[in-house]
Each structure stands twice: as structure tokens, then as C-alpha cells.
């Protein structure tokens, strides 16, 4: 067929090409959906068209641009899956030296596999990728695409390299992304975000509220709801396959990560994975962040001058599947969908079809995990299986106050030893943009500016900018208190690292674990589990190529500051055990708006009587002052998932009316058998927080301190977790009296998306504490 394909964001090139492939057989209605099994033994071919290649195996046909390494087209049995196409945040395009090559020639292996590569060599000069929020880099970048016989998709990977003759540099936000055809209308992230999406037209008609990525929908199935791209974030470790499918064409397209070793932030890193683009006619998109900056996890990737560094990102498998037979909704189902617009009842047939495609993608993820590391990746720093090691051991909990010695949902990983990032110092504070690159979050561009210099922004090259230099900012080049060039040094731990590889696994309840396929090196072993407050760590774990290393019994003795008096919830690094923190609810936009009506008198929680599942809200935020958000047509505006929000008007941001609240005080009541002495310690584990004046703590009317947590954007981005932190507040135990006691936690007045997201609270008492004790009040762990 004749197909016009544009280069989209990768350039102005457009080309027409003719594909001669077998059409996908028309699917048929059936009692249960059935996934299509690939039926071909066609050899893989690679064809050079001058400005682009095509890779074809009779199932998929991929078109790759030879300047940018962009995926211009991915045709599956005659059906185009791409809209804007696929690309890396930083690309080789624009490098002083650009080469492209066929790195695996199918003519040499009987058509078993083909691979093409585009490499940009900067020569140590800065290479700016146009329009990339993550900015540019000094690194050499090589982008590769590979396809095997019978592969229902294509593998994409990138190699970032910094030779010893290059200067100091950092890498901003970085990811691989595909922008899809608008036929994809069903999003699948996890069991709770496996759903029909609004249409691109509905998004385009929506009214912005609070931020450009949030819109109140005024039309369609989800009218009177807020669509927000951050509603579809996920912990990357827990979603090995995610993507979109089409309710009409019965095709799915997915990103499959066979491992997270090349991703930042380890086994608890939350990132964007699927959502709509932000413009008025958006493509559905899939993203794979390897250097993510969201939710307080501004991962660090700063390389010193003269440092020899490289990292292989991927291969990621872009998997495409379809249904050979499917379930069809009845007329009654479609009528019900139309009648319930706003808070829709979606046809069960659509969900069964989409779930079948998603579950098949998850099965494919297990296949890819078993194949990892791929034996066909060569010529880069990528050890094969026999060049890697395996680490085993058994963690044993040593805690006399623990209810059990079991370690449910044990997660164990190996990460680079904590290190101080490469650069420190203080950058300038000029804004502007005179002869300089802009600023903004994530890197070059979007505001800021420095005279003759590269400006800044969060997570990129710094806030503000500097004269003739790299500007200032958080996590970037320069600025007060930042993390990168000129930004003030900081210790980088596993939860904030993107520079090195990490290796994580699920352990067993009895503490046993096996970590396979570890690159040779020296690591720190980390572990956390449900029910255990804190984290285990063991240093100097050296892994050799081909070695099986048994660490034996590892005693895990969690920190205690005294005898436990009471607890609320249990530690698991999420808010899912608290009211509305469960998977069906937490990700929905607007719980800070609705909190004040759910708990009109705020919260009073009585230890031993209250139930944290329903009596403790998962986030403590200011108490809203306005009900102007309520849709009068909503049946249950406080609890229904969709359709509860007034639309508002395009010329007014409703957030200006509803977005602030008064101070919120929660009270915890508890009894003591007798008056106390020594030191008491409140331990607060936070799954997330957003910038505000702190969490003020009082005991029986006496203020004892303020916890000032690290901002993780968990509230602004409506999630139940950011980077996890524990905070402690010690106080004189003499404040505790025999009989009834009250502790109050207060969030100050302010914007509704300021406050905390709770994981767990515990009060401990050490009656033998001496003033010269080592416990430091209000310390963050």
C-alpha cells in the first residue's frame, strides 16, 4: 500500500514508500478473545533507501531515519502503529561526526537477525538536541534497532559514551518515547489503570486547570473529569510491559523492559509510562525513562572531566500484538456507555479484549526476561550471561518487637556504592538569555538564560544561569543547593542514581533471594520489606564474571529508639493501606480537593479503636475553602471516580477559586498506663510530600517540633508514592501522662497540593534515655 510518513519531531523530511506485506486477517467475534500467533518464517531483510532503512520480517516493518536514529514507522501486518514516531530524548542528529551502519547483516546469518546503528561523535563539543526537554549532552550517542526472524516488534537501545578526553558534563532527563496512531484508545499500565481513555478531541476541548498537563474534560465519556498525564505513572520495576491497544482494530503496542538494570532509581522508582501528549491534538504515547526526574527521584548522571564512562540503555522491546478473535459489545452495552457519560460504564467486552492483549504482553515480558542478557548484542560494553555473576543469600530479621520474622514482599538489590556527585561549587544567578541557551526544568530551553552561557532549570543545566558559564539550579549545572555542575555536591544513593547499573529481585518471605545476571563490580546490597521500617544495607559485595556468590545468612536488625507504644498502618513505602490510598483511587486527580468534604471536621484517630483503612486519609493536605468544584449532576461527588468536577470556563483557571485551604490538624488519641520519663520518638514514614511549611507536631498541647520533608511532587502528581523517606521527632517523654494523651499533626494553610502522603507512623519510648544519647531529633533517614 502507499503510505505517507513524516519525520514528525525529528526533522522536516517526509517520504512515500510502498510496502508489500500480507494483510492481517480480519478478526472475528467470539466467546473469548484470542491473541494472534505469528505465522511466518520470513527472513529478516534490511534495505537502504538513502536517508532511511527499512527492516522487515513479514510481521513488522520498521523505518529508521539515518540522521536521527528515529523510528519513523512501525507497520504491523499492514497497519501503521506510529503517529509522531519513536525517538530518544537525546539523539545523534547534529553531532559533528555522524556515521550509520548495518551492525548485524542478515545476509551473514541466513536472515535470522538484522541490526542498524546511527552514531554521533561530539568530539567533546556540546550537542544540543532541538526541542528536547532533557537538553543536550557532550556524550557520544549511538542508537541501534534490531529485528529477529519471527519477532513481533523491534528492539531499540542506545549507548551513551564519555571518553577520557572529554570535559565535565551531565545528562538531563532522558527516555525513549513512541507517539502512536490515534486508533489506540485503551491504556494498560496495571490492573487499576487498564481502561478506556478519553479521545484526543476530548482532551483538545478540555479546559486547563492548575497546570498545562491537567484539563477538565467538557465532552466525551469522561466529561466533568480531570484528565492528567501523571495519573498513569507507575513503579517501573512493577510494570514489565505497558502500552496501548485499539478497541476497534484489536491491536496492542507495548514497551517491554526485560530488566531494570539500565533504568534509574532502582526498584521503587516511579515514572511516567503512558499518557497523552500535551498539545490540543495529542498522540497516545509510551515512555521509558532511564534518567527520570519525577517524584523526588531526580536521578543523577554527572560525569567528571577525563572520566571514562558509558552506559547501554536497553535493549527495550517494542512489542506489537493483535487478536484473531474478539468479544463484541452488544447494543445495550453501547447504550449504557452513552447514558453514563461522565462516569462511564465501559463495555466489558472491550476490557476483556484489551486485557487479553495486555496479558499477552506480560507473557512476552517473561520470555524477554528469560533471554536476558541478549546474546546478539555485541561491540559495546554489554557482558553476556557467562560474563556476569549471581548473588544469593538469606536475610534474617532480628527484631524482638516484630510481630513476625517473615519478610513479605521482600525486595533486594545491588547498586553502586553511595558516592558524591562529580561536581560542586556555586553557580551564578543571572536570568536573562543574552547570547545563551534558555533554562527551564529538565535542561536547555524554556526560560532562564545566562549571558553567553548555558542556563538552568530543575534537573537539567540549573536554575537561572551564569555569566559565561553553566547556570544554577537543582540537580543540574550550577545554582544554590543543586546537585550538578556548580550546584553543591550531594551524596547519591541507589534511589537517586542514573549513572550506574542496578540489579533488583523479589525475595521470598523466608528471606532467601537470588540476584542473577549481575555485571562484575563492587556493590552495596540493599533490601526492604513490608512490615519492616527502614532498609538493610551491606557494603563491599564484589561480583566476578561467571561467579556464583553466596552471602549466606545476613542479620537484619532494624533501628529502634525504644519500646513501641503504638503504630498507625504498616510500613510498605506506599499509602495503599489508608483510606482512598488503594489502587482503585489514589491516582485519580482531585483527592486534595475532596478531602475537606470527606472529613469535614478533619481526623481524630483513637489508637485501639479506629481503623486506619477507613479512618486515616492517605494524604494530609490543607482543608479546602470552596465547594465550587462540585458538579451538581454527579450522584456521589465525594466518592465517584469520574464526572464529579464542574467544567469551568476557558478564560478562568478554576484552581484560582478552589486551590487553597486552611490549616489542617489531625489528632491521635492514646492511653498510657503510667506517666513517662526519658525520651519519646515519633517516627513518620512518608511515601511522598510536596513543598510547604512542614508538619508541626504537638503533644498534649505542647509543640515539640516541625518535620520538614523533602518534596517529591506526590500530591501535585496525584500518586501514592514518591521517593520514600523516614523522619523522626524526639521529645521529652515527661509530656506523656497517665491515662488519655493527644498528639496533633498540623499541615499549614496553603495550596491544596501541599502536604504529606503517609506510609506509616510509630511512637517509641526509651525510658532509660540519657541526654548524651545518640538519637538526633528530626533526623531524616
Region roles according to the model:
Residues 47, 90-163:
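Extended, loop-rich substrate-binding clefts of extracytoplasmic carbohydrate-active enzymes
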Residues 652-653, 658-677, 685-780:
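Beta-strand-rich ligand-recognition modules
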Amino acid at each position: 500500500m502507499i503510505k505517507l510518513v513524516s519525520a514528525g519531531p525529528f526533522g522536516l523530511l517526509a517520504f512515500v514508500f510502498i510496502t508489500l506485506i500480507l494483510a492481517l486477517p480480519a478478526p472475528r467475534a467470539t466467546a473469548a478473545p484470542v491473541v494472534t500467533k505469528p505465522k511466518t518464517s520470513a527472513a529478516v531483510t534490511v534495505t537502504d533507501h538513502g536517508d532511511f532503512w527499512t527492516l522487515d520480517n513479514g510481521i513488522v516493518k520498521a523505518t529508521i531515519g539515518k540522521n536521527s536514529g528515529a523510528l519513523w514507522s512501525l507497520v504491523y501486518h499492514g497497519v501503521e502503529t506510529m503517529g509522531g514516531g519513536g525517538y530518544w530524548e537525546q539523539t545523534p542528529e547534529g553531532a559533528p561526526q555522524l556515521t550509520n551502519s548495518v551492525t548485524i547483516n542478515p545476509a551473514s546469518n541466513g536472515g535470522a537477525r538484522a541490526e542498524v546503528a546511527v552514531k554521533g561523535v561530539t568530539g567533546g563539543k556540546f550537542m544540543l538536541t532541538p526541542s528536547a526537554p532533557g537538553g543536550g549532552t557532550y556524550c557520544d550517542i549511538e542508537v541501534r534497532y534490531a529485528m529477529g526472524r519471527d519477532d513481533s516488534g523491534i528492539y531499540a537501545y542506545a549507548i551513551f559514551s564519555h571518553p577520557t578526553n572529554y570535559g565535565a558534563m551531565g545528562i538531563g532527563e532522558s527516555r525513549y518515547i513512541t507517539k502512536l496512531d490515534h486508533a489506540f484508545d485503551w491504556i494498560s499500565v496495571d490492573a487499576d489503570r487498564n481502561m478506556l481513555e478519553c479521545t484526543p478531541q476530548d482532551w483538545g476541548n478540555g479546559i486547563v486547570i492548575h497546570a498545562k498537563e491537567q484539563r477538565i474534560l467538557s465532552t466525551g465519556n469522561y466529561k466533568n473529569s480531570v484528565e492528567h498525564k501523571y495519573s498513569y505513572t507507575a513503579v517501573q520495576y512493577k510494570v514489565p510491559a505497558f502500552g496501548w491497544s485499539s478497541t476497534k482494530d484489536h491491536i496492542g503496542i507495548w514497551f517491554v523492559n526485560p530488566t531494570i538494570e539500565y533504568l534509574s532509581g532502582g526498584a521503587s522508582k516511579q515514572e511516567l509510562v503512558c499518557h497523552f501528549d500535551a498539545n490540543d491534538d495529542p498522540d497516545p504515547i509510551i515512555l521509558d525513562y532511564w534518567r527520570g526526574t519525577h517524584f523526588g527521584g531526580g536521578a543523577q548522571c554527572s560525569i567528571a572531566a577525563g572520566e571514562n564512562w558509558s552506559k547501554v540503555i536497553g535493549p527495550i522491546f517494542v512489542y506489537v500484538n493483535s487478536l484473531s478473535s474478539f468479544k463484541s459489545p452488544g447494543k445495550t452495552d453501547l447504550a449504557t456507555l452513552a447514558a453514563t457519560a461522565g462516569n462511564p460504564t465501559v463495555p466489558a467486552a472491550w476490557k476483556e479484549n484489551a486485557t487479553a492483549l495486555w496479558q499477552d504482553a506480560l507473557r512476552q515480558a517473561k520470555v524477554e526476561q528469560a533471554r536476558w542478557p541478549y546474546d546478539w548484542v555485541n561491540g559495546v560494553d554489554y557482558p553476556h550471561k557467562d560474563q556476569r555473576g549471581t548473588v544469593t543469600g538469606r536475610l534474617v530479621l532480628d527484631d524482638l518487637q516484630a510481630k513476625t520474622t517473615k519478610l513479605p514482599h521482600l525486595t533486594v538489590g545491588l547498586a553502586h556504592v553511595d558516592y558524591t556527585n562529580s561536581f560542586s561549587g556555586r553557580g551564578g544567578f543571572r536570568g536573562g538569555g543574552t547570547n545563551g541557551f534558555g533554562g527551564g526544568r529538565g535542561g536547555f530551553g524554556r526560560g532562564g538564560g545566562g549571558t553567553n552561557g548555558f542556563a538552568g532549570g530543575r534537573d537539567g543545566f540549573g536554575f537561572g544561569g551564569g555569566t559565561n558559564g553553566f547556570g544554577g539550579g537543582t540537580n543540574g549545572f550550577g545554582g544554590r543547593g543543586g546537585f550538578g555542575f556548580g550546584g553543591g555536591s550531594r551524596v547519591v544513593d541507589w534511589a537517586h542514581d542514573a549513572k550506574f547499573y542496578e540489579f533488583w529481585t523479589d525475595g521470598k518471605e523466608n528471606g532467601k533471594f537470588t540476584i542473577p545476571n549481575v555485571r562484575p563490580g563492587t556493590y552495596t546490597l540493599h533490601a526492604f520489606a513490608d512490615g519492616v521500617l527502614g532498609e538493610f544495607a551491606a557494603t563491599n559485595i564484589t561480583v566476578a564474571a561467571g561467579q556464583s556468590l553466596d552471602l549466606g545468612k545476613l542479620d537484619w536488625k532494624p533501628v529502634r529508639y525504644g519500646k513501641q507504644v503504638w503504630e498507625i498502618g504498616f510500613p510498605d513505602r506506599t499509602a495503599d493501606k489508608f483510606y482512598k490510598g488503594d489502587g482503585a483511587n489514589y491516582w485519580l486527580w482531585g483527592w486534595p480537593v475532596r478531602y475537606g468534604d470527606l472529613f469535614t471536621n478533619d481526623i481524630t484517630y483513637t489508637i485501639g479503636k479506629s481503623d486506619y483503612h477507613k479512618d486515616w486519609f492517605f494524604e494530609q493536605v490543607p482543608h479546602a475553602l470552596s465547594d465550587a468544584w462540585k458538579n451538581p449532576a454527579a450522584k456521589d461527588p465525594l466518592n465517584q471516580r469520574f464526572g464529579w468536577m464542574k467544567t469551568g470556563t476557558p478564560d478562568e483557571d478554576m484552581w484560582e477559586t478552589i486551590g487553597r485551604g486552611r490549616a489542617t490538624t489531625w489528632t491521635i488519641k492514646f492511653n498510657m498506663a503510667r506517666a513517662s520519663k526519658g525520651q519519646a520518638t515519633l517516627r513518620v514514614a512518608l511515601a511522598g510530600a510536596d513543598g510547604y511549611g512542614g508538619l508541626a507536631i504537638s503533644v498534649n498541647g505542647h509543640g515539640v517540633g516541625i518535620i520538614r520533608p523533602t518534596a517529591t511532587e506526590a500530591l501535585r502528581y496525584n500518586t501514592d508514592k514518591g521517593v520514600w523517606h523516614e523522619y523522626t521527632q524526639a521529645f521529652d517523654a515527661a509530656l506523656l501522662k497517665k491515662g488519655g494523651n493527644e498528639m496533633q499533626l498540623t499541615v499549614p494553610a496553603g495550596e491544596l497540593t501541599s502536604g504529606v502522603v503517609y506510609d506509616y507512623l510509630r511512637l517509641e519510648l526509651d525510658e532509660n534515655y540519657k541526654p548524651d544519647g545518640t538519637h538526633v531529633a528530626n533526623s531524616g533517614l
